[in-house]
């Protein structure tokens, strides 16, 4: 908890020293404590005069990148540890372009973080007070719907015959299910089987050693349904 607060204070100090918009989008995935860390980051940002735009539920990382640009933010934070084992969680920072920050920017943010005392150097505001002050705002459904539409608009071909496609999908107990189902429905793919044991978000990832689709063990249950 203290590490997340310290990192966020450093990020806030960095952003406040630039000409970038004083607004940061935050998302988290299904990893343990993701919601808690999201709220703590929002509290710190609000206390530093930065508007925290928070997804109200877990969302995949690309949705965070989209929100940064869609909402005109100066940066973004995703509470995630990608494909690492369940014991980990992480803190990824994205630039105003929605991309992961460059090494040059990372060095500047790290320098700001290192100056922060995690006990006495962090500004905090009560979460509800931040909401009432308009410094903590919820990202609405239109943002995510427009994200799905933007992905759909990149499709290749006219979709002829796609209704015959039979698909097995697994979110690996992560966060992709909602967006993937919406996108497949728009494409006209109706024969979709979701791996039942891996459908529900679960930060313990009980069905595989770690949620990396590049390893066979993670995809084994899906392969068995094919």
Features from the language model and the residues they span:
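Short, highly selective alpha-helical patches that border small-molecule cofactor pockets
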Residues: 4, 8, 34, 38, ...
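Glycine-rich phosphate/diphosphate-binding loops that line cofactor/substrate pockets in enzymes
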Residues: 7-24, 156-163
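N-terminal small/polar loop signature for handling phosphorylated ligands or for N-terminal nucleophile
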Residues: 13, 17-88, 183-226
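Residue-level detector of functional hotspots within protein domains
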Residues: 9, 77-79, 95
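Gly/Ser/Thr-enriched, mixed-charge loops and adjacent short helices
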Residues: 2-3, 89-218
